[in-house]
Amino acid sequence: LKKRSKKLLSPQARGSSGARPNGSTAAFSGQVHVIGAGLAGLAAALRLAASGRKVTLYEAGPACGGRCRSYFDRELGCRIDNGNHLLLSGNDAAMAYLDAIGARHTLGGPDAPTFPFLDLATGERWTVRPSPGRLPWWLFSSSRRIPGAKPAEYLALARLMLASAEATVANVVPAGELTRRLLEPLAVSALNTPVAAGNARLFAAVIAGSLARGGAQCIPLTPREGLSESFVDPTLAKLAALGAEVKTGHRISAIGTTAGRATSLTGPDGRIELDSGDAIVLATPGPVAATLLPGTAAPDAFEAIVNLHFLAQADPGEAGFIGLIGGLAEWVFVKPGVVSVTISAANRLLEQPADDLVRTLWGEVRQATGLVGEMPRWRLIREKRATFAATFAQQQRRPRATTPLENLVLAGDWTDTGLPATIEGAIRSGFTAAQLLGAAL
């Protein structure tokens, strides 16, 4: 869901600030210290190590991957993903990352762009099937488009691309079946922000990188096994093969600076002095980066995501997921032995009693999948600060990758990638950071 057109790319995302923060690649030919092993940090470390740089990756927690990881859940007795993520075949940065670690085959999905939906209120089901090329002839096929949507409604996509910087999705996209049955659920999922507040330009970037490029770029993909098995474990193996060092449970608590350069790190083993050619990629969450590097702007308003996993076996259908209209959940994902539900922009649900929430969602899952019988074992995960709120105000707080320190760059989906907080944005930011420090494309 994630790459945007050149017209919409920020200067940082286009790399117009030059190959390096200070211009000269040779100046930073030493060791690179990558702080934070989420996808942004992993992507930066991977590209730097592949370019022959000595890399040390520090992760404060016990495991790498950040919000994109899998773990064994004792309540369910099986491995589950921390959250549900849907990728598209046109996510260029994510696909390049997976190719670099030899893991593209770990994603699965239909052979063609296929997006099944269910309207919970009416019981109506349909499947959106964009045509392969850029010409949207699928809009004229009743078996491929949104039922009930009038042809004029599709002009909303053009208006979205011309939205002002401050416009919200709700300002730009008119009421109608296209909005209710496609654009609104896509916007809420991509931005993790209600459409009344979600920034229209950020959503336009998502559309520009997916629907606007044609159906061949919109084939939905999900991990066959788990997020860690696709994005984390192969990366750690590749980094080890390239000679990079990965230190988990290793929190960096301070960055020393002198005369416009980062000169030291402080970790659990004490102070680490940087040589003149060394550099840092600061790939922690925004609030942590602002603490380590005072004066760093970062988003300070956040939205939650709720994920619910049921221990149940269901028919995955054609795509392995289904979009829900008119309920609490936006998506239901079906994997062997586990049925998962995702609710985006979920701040409103943080205080709702778990039993009430699960009961409602189980009803939606039953309607979507045809499951019968008593509610199975479940695990509810409320991630309170899942992403920054994708509003105009928060967009203004997203920093470029470069910093006042000539040998320190930023990475993370919260930086100004030109996209909302997504896997594609996180990986893109890591690649940008590596390029700024001289890594080959």
Q: Where in this protein do the model-derived segments appear?
A:
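Mobile amphipathic helical/loop "lid" adjacent to a hydrophobic cofactor/ligand pocket
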Residues: G90-A208, Q217
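N-terminal Rossmann-like FAD-binding beta1-loop-alpha1 element of flavoenzymes
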Residues: G30-L57
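Helical element adjacent to the flavin cofactor pocket in flavoenzyme catalytic cores
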Residues: V206-D269
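Glycine-rich active-site loop/strand segments that organize a redox cofactor
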Residues: G66-G90, A156-M161
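Mid-domain catalytic core of redox enzymes
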Residues: F28, P113, H250-G370, R400-T402
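Conserved flavin/dinucleotide-binding core of flavoenzymes
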Residues: R129-P130, V332-L441
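Short beta-strand to alpha-helix junction loop
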Residues: H85-D92, A163-A165, P174, G214-K238, ...
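Glycine-rich FAD pyrophosphate-binding loop
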Residues: A49-R74
